UniProtKB/Swiss-Prot annotation:
Location of the PDZ domain: 775-861, 950-1035, 1079-1167
Tissue: Expressed in epithelial cells.
Compositional bias ranges of the Polar residues kind: 240-249
Annotated ranges, domain FERM: 342-642
Region (Disordered): 214-249, 266-302, 859-880, 1204-1228
CDD domains: FERM_B-lobe, FERM_C_PTPH13, FERM_F1_FRMPD2, PDZ2-PTPN13_FRMPD2-like, PDZ3_PTPN13_FRMPD2-like
Presence of keyword NAD: no
Role: Functions as a scaffold protein and likely plays a role in N-methyl-D-aspartic acid receptor (NMDAR)-mediated synaptic excitatory transmission. May be involved in synapse formation in cone photoreceptor cells. May play a role in the regulation of tight junction formation. Binds phosphatidylinositol 3,4-bisphosphate (PtdIns(3,4)P2). May play a role in the regulation of NOD2-mediated NF-kappa-B activation in immune response.
Species of the source: Homo sapiens (Human)
The protein's name: FERM and PDZ domain-containing protein 2
Length: 1309
């Protein structure tokens, strides 16, 4: 759109109103507003007569000329103009109800001048406007067009004011010339000092104006570019759209009129924006939010706009490209003329196109610096420039010259005649494991934009339900909450902007529109950044999150075989492509990768576990080398994140290129830190709350030199706060790195918790701001125990919810100590950190502790003791009060009983939190007190198969009293370490909990996963006298024995086969098959078979002996529905003759996806009432931990993955009524897992599984977000399939075997 007035074009003698305000740094005076009002009204009337008023009046379209005139330009960003558009234009009108252009301009002009009058005015301070001017502006900004004053009446009011001011009033043009002179004079001075070699005065002025505008806005760090970046120049036509002032709305006084502030206005808070707000006389409204940046960038305006129906990246993609010039020192110092420059198109993540003027010899790094400076990005580590080839993105090195990768003809031909378009894309190259690691909201927004587009373009796999949920979250982020005035069945958004085309084709656009609208209506209120953060939380759980996929071929080049390599920060994934779906076949983590090499077109990965070489063929040697460099860069990024360096520090990729196949001893000598990390299986994961501030890093706290008094200083001086994201603050926590001793010859690190003096074995913790760390010693009371009640954190589904003190028992030891307060988190007990401990593990640890315990607690600052208000708040947050607990009879004296007692306590609803948490029953096991005079040790708790338990053994004669077998160098399944035998009368036999066949998971904090047999033995025979073991029960205990020194339990008990000790599939499958059995033949179409299925767990119905696979939904117009014989709820007994009996979820999924075109299903229709009805509504996934990249370790050269899935993911429940995306309440719980079958780009999660998910139920759940409406549903299971492996089971010291359902477990000591 061209400027529509004769002075509209941006020239050397014209500036925008926004530029003048930014340079000036303060609001317009009253006389200046009168002058602008007069000149603008005249110009608008003239443009309306000439039918040339096709523009929106706003601070960026109002051009002030040096001659003292005012005009308007039409070349303004839609995002910037939107807040000043009249409401009737935003709402849309029918063809026969065209709005009055004059009235729309009146509204926009009034909003623009009111915006200028409130520029940089504090929220609490009223505007200094006289009554006549204030009344005119308020009348111009009326919501209803018929209530606004006309342009003629505005002119008349200006003439009346001119007569009343003075005998000799200053001309209106004089105020305009002063504003223009302020800007142009400033530019001239800076121009002379900074830029001397540029041949274009216009381009210098554009660049310096933009730099000045951005530099003067200091209220928002994100609005300023890093000083180290090279400057760039923007053409005059695009300068003022980048950075502009934003006023604070303040008091409107002395007026009988009212002003409707649209939610599109900058500075308004979300609640008031949504409903609209009337600012009337005598009322004070502080609509400005200090969290919003002063400079309203496109990002800021997008968050505060109203009734937008299109996403940001679609709106900006349709606009004309903005011209960006590289700095003069780059393109002109060699004497290059302007015409010798070439046009390079750079597409930003928000869809905006930049036309970069550059030299043919310019480097990618120079373009990257200019583009990121233009986009105001600060955390540059994660971004890169890439070009597209065959629908794949290839990132460029910063030193690469553009002429080396430009298309043919781009270098030779001048820009005016060149028909070859050279396009680069600014994209995210390195993905963080959690958005909390991103320090700036603008960076998080860029992640949101890329993931949003990748899902829409089907580059990132999602199943159907998650696609719909993400569509709703994107709608909330970009549109807002469901409009109250919305008429049912009337569309208010474009379906294709939020849902991928394949799903629309499968479900029909009308049905998608209805379902998304209904989910939007019922979803909890979210707005702006909060919705974006929730969007990121869900996408970061997807198995393909952060994976850069490139097509490769097998070494034998079979035409029917399609393969792809996925490279991410954790390693390399090998995919097999079938039916447009990617199936993960192999996974190589960096620690399992011995060598990556290339030779011509061949790309080879050598496994350090099996020694096998896996060779793939690329389309060219250049691609092969690129994949090697990409692996090196991703490995380096992962090492940088794991080392605790600040994420904004750029790292040198060359430091991580060396990936030779060294021996373990050599690797240990050369890189001890990496070797320790590899052995500990930590995979360099960072917990989100372990960030420091801007100079942050990993808060590494050891058990050394714990000093309570010094913790306050450390907390005040050395700790930065975790980033706040929206209304949700990520609470910081201490990272407990347990002391490790390392020997390059012996191999694995051995924990030395007991080596050295007692002081050296203590941990130091650093208090968060507003909190303190206390150390207290308690003595057990025979009646009240230790006198406090503990519970798991409010959000127990996350990776480390923590152990908290919910209340203090009156008269107990804790109350007498006068230092413990409810709500405090127990960090350590008897010098053992509780980080990563589950509730049950903490219960056993406290119950088995001696009569004197030492606690390290982090609690809020204040007077010690029990504050009734604090206790009330604490118990309200946890949902369990001490009174409630005592009413159940759970007092400390119960622990003196000599027999095991199992009690079922019904979970209480969380007080004060509207959350879709289904009721469930949780079993607590209590351990008796140790009896000194008992000849028989206390009977241990009943531990079910698959449960993890904690044992502390004191060595006798240097032994623990049991032998082990297994290791990755043995034939034991999955390379685990198992208890082979129990020595009669030894420490293990006396303790009584350990059984033959149990799997040993951890010894003194050292994870045994991935270790050889010798290394595991070395861990067990470490120097410490007390060994703290974490084990997994493999077989149920048949009888409890009271062993003594004379018992021959080990001899009498037959050896347990390690194979049979592993939980296997049921020997038989007794399905509900009383109904008729029938066979159906289906033929796949482009969308698959056209149905989704769920796996119903046997725990959901008492009469089931095995899992059932049931059809959940039939998609309209697809083969399953067209067949007519299949109905929702039918049981799938077999697929192509292979029975589903005993198969786990992933195997059924792969069985259906890998089937040929014609599929034969053996179905059974259960009798009515035999099984619960399937819920067809949508459910909300648990917004939980970031998935880990994993692959199973094989001892042979297996070609299919061995993947583990956490046992707890098999538990699912339908939500109760409340907030979230669940639509209607359900009283019954269902244990189901669902997979949508029929999406043309849907990727199954694994090709085959060789063992059941019960094998490793202790998988770690990292970075679990604290969310008030977290649920575990079938969606979560879909998200988490194929995300775990034996070698990546858990992070150091973290375990989670509880149900992912949010629960509150309490006990008293």
């Amino acid at each position: 759109m061209q400027p529509l007035t004769k002075d509209a074009g941006m020239s050397l003698s014209s500036v925008t109103l926004a530029s003048a305000l930014q340079v000036r740094g303060e609001a317009l005076s009253e006389e200046e507003i009168w002058s602008l009002l007069f000149l603008a009204a005249e110009q608008l009337l003239e443009d309306l007569r000439n039918d040339s008023s096709d523009y929106v009046v706003c601070p960026w379209s109002a051009l002030l000329s040096a001659a003292g005139s005012l005009s308007f330009q039409g070349r303004v960003s839609h995002i910037e103009a939107a807040p000043f558009k009249a409401p009737e234009l935003l709402q849309g009108q029918s063809e026969d109800e065209q709005p009055d252009a004059s009235q729309m301009h009146v509204y926009s002009l009034g909003m623009t001048l009111y915006w200028s009058a409130g520029f940089h005015v504090p929220p609490h301070q009223p505007l200094q406007l006289c009554e006549p001017l204030h009344s005119i502006l308020l009348t111009m900004c009326e919501d209803q067009p018929h209530r606004r004053c006309t342009l003629q009446s505005v002119l008349e009011a200006c003439r009346v004011h001119e007569k009343e001011v003075s005998v000799y009033p200053a001309p209106a043009g004089l105020h305009i010339r002063r504003l223009v002179g302020l800007v142009l004079g400033t530019i001239s001075e800076v121009e002379k000092r900074v830029v001397e070699e540029s041949s274009s005065v216009q381009q210098n002025r554009s660049y310096l104006l933009r730099k000045r505008l951005r530099g003067t806005s200091s209220e928002s760090p994100a609005a300023q570019a890093p000083e180290c970046l090279h400057p760039c120049r923007v053409s005059e036509r695009s300068t003022e759209t980048q950075s502009s002032p934003e006023p604070h709305w303040s008091t409107l006084t002395h007026s009988h009129c009212s002003l409707l502030v649209n939610r599109a206005l900058p500075g308004a808070d979300p609640q008031d924006q949504q409903a609209g707000r009337r600012l009337s006389s005598g009322s004070v409204h502080s609509a400005a939010d200090s969290s919003w940046p002063t400079t309203p960038s496109q990002r800021g305006f997008l968050q505060r706009r109203s009734k937008f129906s299109r996403p940001e990246f679609i709106l900006l993609a349709g606009e004309a490209p903005m011209t960006l010039h590289l700095p003069g020192s780059v393109v002109t110092k060699k004497g290059k003329s302007y015409l010798a420059l070439r046009d390079l198109c750079v597409v930003l993540l928000n869809g905006q196109h930049l036309e970069v003027k550059c030299d043919v010899e310019s480097t990618v790094g120079a373009v990257f610096n200019a583009v990121t400076s233009f986009a105001n990005l600060e955390e540059l580590t994660y971004f890169g420039l890439a070009y597209m080839k065959s629908k794949e993105f290839f990132f460029l090195d910063s030193e690469t010259r553009l002429c080396k990768i430009a298309p043919e003809g781009w270098r030779e031909q001048p820009q005016k005649t060149s028909m070859n378009t050279f396009t680069l894309f600014l994209r995210i190259k390195f993905f963080v494991s959690h958005y909390g690691l991103l320090q700036h909201s603008l960076t998080r927004h860029q992640f949101y934009l890329q993931l949003r587009k990748d899902i829409l373009e089907e580059r990132l796999y999602c199943n159907e339900e998650i696609l719909l949920q993400l569509g709703v979250l994107a709608l909330q982020a970009e549109f807002g909450n469901y409009p109250k005035e919305q008429v049912e069945s009337k569309p208010y958004f474009h379906v294709e902007d939020y849902i991928p085309a394949s799903l629309i084709e499968r479900m029909t656009a009308l049905r998608v529109q209805v379902e998304v609208s209904e989910m939007h209506r019922l979803s909890s209120a979210l707005w702006g950044e909060d919705a974006e953060l929730k969007f990121l939380r869900v996408t970061q759980q997807l198995p393909e999150y952060g994976v850069l996929v490139h097509q490769v071929f097998s070494e034998k080049r079979r035409p029917e075989e399609e393969m792809a390599l996925g490279i991410c920060a954790k390693g390399v994934i090998v995919y097999e492509v079938k039916n447009n779906s990617r199936i993960a076949m192999l996974r190589f983590q960096w620690r399992e990768t011995g060598k990556i090499s290339t030779y011509q077109k061949k790309f080879t990965i050598t496994s350090s576990v099996t020694g096998k070489k896996h060779t793939f063929v690329t389309d060219s040697a250049k691609t092969s080398k690129y994949l090697l460099d990409l692996c090196s860069a991703q490995h380096g990024f992962n090492a940088q994140m794991g080392s605790g360096q600040p994420s904004h520090v750029l790292f040198d990729h060359d430091k991580f290129v060396q990936m030779a196949n060294l021996s373990p001893a050599h690797q240990a000598r050369s890189k001890p830190l990496i070797w320790i990390q590899r052995l500990s299986c930590s995979e360099n994961e960072l917990f989100v709350s372990r960030l420091q501030g801007a100079a942050g890093g990993l808060l590494s706290t050891s058990m050394d030199n714990f000093n309570v008094d010094g913790s306050k200083e450390a907390g005040a001086e050395g700790i930065g706060r975790s980033p706040c994201t929206g209304r949700e603050q990520l609470k910081s926590a201490c990272v407990i790195q347990k002391p490790m001793t390392w020997d390059s010859l012996s191999g694995p690190p051995v924990q030395s918790m007991h080596a050295g003096s007692k002081n050296n074995r203590r941990k130091s913790f650093i208090a968060e701001p507003g909190r303190e760390i206390v150390r207290v010693t308690l003595k057990r009371d025979p009646h009240r125990g230790f006198g406090f009640v503990i519970n798991e954190g409010e959000y127990s589904g996350q990776a480390d919810p923590g152990i908290f003190i919910s209340s203090i028992i009156p008269g107990g030891p804790a109350e007498k100590a006068k230092t413990i307060k409810p709500g405090g988190q127990i960090l350590a007990l008897n010098h053992i950190s509780l980080e990563g401990f589950t509730f049950n593990m903490a219960v056993r640890m406290i119950q088995n502790s001696p009569d004197n315990i030492e606690l390290i607690i982090s609690q809020s600052k204040g007077v010690g003791g029990n504050n009734p208000d604090e206790e009330k708040n604490s118990t309200a947050n946890s949902g369990v009060s001490s009174t409630d607990i005592l009413s159940f009879g759970y007092q400390g004296s119960l622990l003196s009983h000599t027999q095991d007692q199992d009690r079922n306590t019904e979970e209480l609803d969380m007080a004060g939190v509207q959350s879709l948490v289904p009721r469930l029953r949780h079993q607590l096991s209590f351990l008796p007190l140790k009896g000194a005079g008992s000849s028989c040790p206390p009977s241990p708790p009943e531990i079910s198969a698959g449960e993890i338990y904690f044992v502390e053994l004191v060595k006798e004669d240097g032994t623990l009293g049991f032998s082990v077998t297994g290791g990755i160098n043995t034939s034991v399944p999955y390379g685990g370490i198992y208890v082979k035998s129990i020595v009669p009368g030894g420490p293990a036999a006396k303790e009584g909990q350990i059984l033959q066949g149990d799997r040993l998971l951890q010894v003194d904090g050292v994870i045994l996963c991935g270790l050889t047999h010798k290394q595991a033995v070395q861990c067990l025979t470490g120097p410490g006298q007390v060994a703290r073991l974490v084990l997994e029960r493999r077989v149920p205990r048949s009888t409890q024995q009271c062993p003594s020194a004379n018992d021959s339990m080990g001899d009498e008990r037959t050896a347990v086969s390690l194979v049979t000790a592993l939980p296997g599939r049921p020997s038989s499958c007794v399905s509900v098959t009383d109904g008729p059995k029938f066979e159906v033949k289906l033929k796949k179409n482009a969308n698959g078979l056209g149905f989704s299925f769920v796996q119903m767990e046997k725990e959901s119905c008492s009469h089931l002996k095995s899992d059932l696979v049931r059809i959940k939904r039939l998609f309209p117009g697809q083969p399953a529905e067209e067949n007519g014989a299949i109905a929702a709820g039918d049981i799938i007994l077999a697929v192509n003759g292979r029975s589903t009996e005993g198969l786990i979820f992933q195997e059924v999924l792969h069985l259906l996806r890998g089937a040929p075109q014609e599929v034969t299903l053996l179905l059974c229709r259960p009798p009515p009432g035999a099984l619960p009805e399937l819920e067809q509504e949508w459910q909300t996934p648990e917004l939980s931990a970031d998935k880990e990249f994993t692959r199973a370790t094989c001892t042979d050269s297996c070609t299919s993955p061995i993947l583990d899935q956490e046992d707890s993911w098999r538990d699912s429940a339908s939500p109760d009524a409340g907030e979230g995306l669940g639509l209607r309440p359900e009283s019954s719980q269902k244990a189901i897992r669902e997979a949508q079958w029929g999406q043309n780009r849907e990727r199954p999660w694994a090709s085959s599984l060789t063992h059941s998910p019960e094998s490793h139920p202790h998988l770690c759940k990292l970075h679990q977000e604290r969310d008030e409406s977290t649920l575990a549903t079938s969606l979560e299971k879909d998200v988490r399939q194929n995300c775990y492996s034996v070698c990546d089971i858990m992070r150091l010291g973290r375990y989670s075997f509880s149900s992912p359902l949010t629960r509150l477990s309490t006990d008293i000591f």
